[in-house]
């Protein structure tokens, strides 16, 4: 990491400002070469914005603010310089070119954060949280990413690792001093601790919650043709996303939209009406609808309460058994024929909500239901699929160690415990291969 890197840190296109970031030993030399402070002189004070001009020889390139953050009190723990320029691709590209011609090289994706990790300012789980924070679409995801960035996952894993080290020390003592600690005594003392640690880690592995934070809740609206699915989708989204007509079978393909409720991201999919049809195009739509239902986290079965329950409706109700979802009685603004009491037996304990797509206030219970399905505990510790996979490997190794220890094979249990330790170290990056680092930081944008 002896070389100095530079990149544009803001999104391309026109904007209020553009930022060019430089990190490395030559950062201050580059600052001196291309920045002329107004009413001041070099060296600039650290961590203070200074007004001046970017220059190329005697030519003024832009009026800007510049700041130097001297090591180790910077994002990368190296000397870091940032130029805050007028927004626009031309200016930023010119300033970047000046930095490169002055001795820096173009940064790779995620290289600034990678240096923060390699220089010990953050661990790998915190580095990944930076990407999660950038990618967060909802308040719930932002909060989870911020907890991880401030060390939530790190402290949990390090506490688990400390307990594991203590258990390993007990195993080592039994192996080194068998005359003082028998294998039976070691098993009696250590096996319960291993089991407790395995449970603690397993309880933190909530794949569904982690996926909700990463991708949002997938909701599919299903039902027979002309029950108001498309109208309901439009009403929930607050826009005319799907075409609505009185003709059954208007929706033939999937129509998707995204809704934000209580800080959670919810992806809605309106599907073609589920029924038998000889129309080949409509049949394709029905097949796609069934696939969307299979992939959904929540299924909303929409029924028209202004008409009686049909045999096809009853078939859909039976298909909903065992799935996560609710029954939506639509068209409550019309004279009711079908009521909640008519569906109590067929509902299989699922919520029954009465709404009208044409009456916005009636949608609040449905929105509350969807928000509850998308909610994730504020106490969630592991939010990255990679972390959960590593923790599950640690749990499996701990279970094996417990079983081996209870068989009084202390030395073999030590091998299993070492496997668990390596899995935990993968999460924080204490033990990690270069290939994994390339994969993690390759997901970042250039300039971060």
Task: Enumerate the predicted regions with their spans.
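Switch I (G2) and immediately adjacent beta-strands of P-loop GTPase domains
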Residues: 50-62, 66-70, 249-277, 295-298
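Short beta->alpha junction loops/turns
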Residues: 23-24, 88, 248, 305-306, ...
């Amino acid at each position: 990491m002896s070389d100095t890197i530079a990149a544009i840190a803001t999104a391309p296109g026109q904007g209020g400002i553009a930022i060019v970031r430089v990190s490395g030993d030559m950062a201050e030399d580059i600052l001196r070469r291309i920045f002329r402070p107004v009413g001041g002189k070099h060296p600039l004070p650290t961590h203070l914005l200074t007004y001046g001009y970017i220059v190329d020889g005697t030519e003024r390139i832009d009026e800007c603010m510049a700041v130097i953050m001297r090591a180790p009190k910077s994002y990368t723990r190296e000397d870091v310089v940032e130029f805050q320029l007028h927004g626009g691709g031309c200016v930023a590209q010119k300033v970047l070119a000046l930095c490169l011609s002055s001795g820096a090289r173009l940064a790779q994706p995620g290289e600034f954060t990678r240096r923060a990790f390699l220089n010990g300012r953050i661990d790998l789980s915190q580095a990944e949280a930076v990407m999660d924070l950038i990618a967060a679409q909802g308040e719930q995801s932002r909060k989870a990413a911020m907890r991880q960035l401030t060390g939530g996952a790190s402290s949990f894993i390090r506490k688990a690792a400390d307990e594991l080290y203590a258990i390993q020390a007990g195993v080592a003592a039994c192996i080194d001093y068998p005359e003082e600690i028998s294998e039976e005594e070691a098993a009696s003392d250590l096996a319960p601790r291993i089991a407790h640690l395995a449970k603690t880690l397993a309880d933190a592995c909530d794949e569904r919650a982690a996926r909700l934070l990463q991708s949002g809740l997938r909701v599919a609206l299903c039902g027979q043709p002309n029950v108001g699915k498309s109208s309901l989708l439009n009403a929930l989204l607050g826009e005319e996303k799907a075409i609505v007509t009185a003709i059954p079978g208007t929706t033939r393909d999937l129509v998707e939209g995204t809704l934000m409720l209580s800080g959670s991201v919810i992806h809605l999919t309106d599907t073609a009406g589920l029924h038998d049809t000889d129309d080949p195009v409509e049949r394709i739509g029905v097949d796609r609808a069934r696939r969307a239902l299979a992939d959904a986290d929540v299924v909303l079965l929409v029924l028209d309460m202004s008409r009686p329950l049909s045999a096809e409706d009853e078939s859909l109700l039976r298909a909903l058994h065992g799935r996560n979802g609710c029954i939506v009685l639509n068209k409550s603004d019309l004279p009711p024929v079908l009521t909640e009491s008519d569906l109590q037996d067929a509902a299989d304990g699922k919520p029954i909500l009465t709404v009208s797509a044409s009456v916005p206030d009636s949608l609040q219970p449905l929105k509350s239901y969807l928000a509850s399905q998308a909610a994730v505990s504020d106490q969630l510790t592991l939010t990255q699929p990679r972390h959960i996979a590593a923790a599950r490997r640690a749990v499996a190794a701990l279970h094996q160690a417990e079983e081996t220890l209870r068989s009084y094979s202390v030395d073999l249990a030590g091998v299993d415990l070492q496997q668990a330790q390596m899995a935990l170290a993968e999460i924080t990056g204490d033990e990690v291969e270069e290939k994994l680092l390339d994969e993690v930081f390759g997901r970042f944008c250039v300039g971060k």
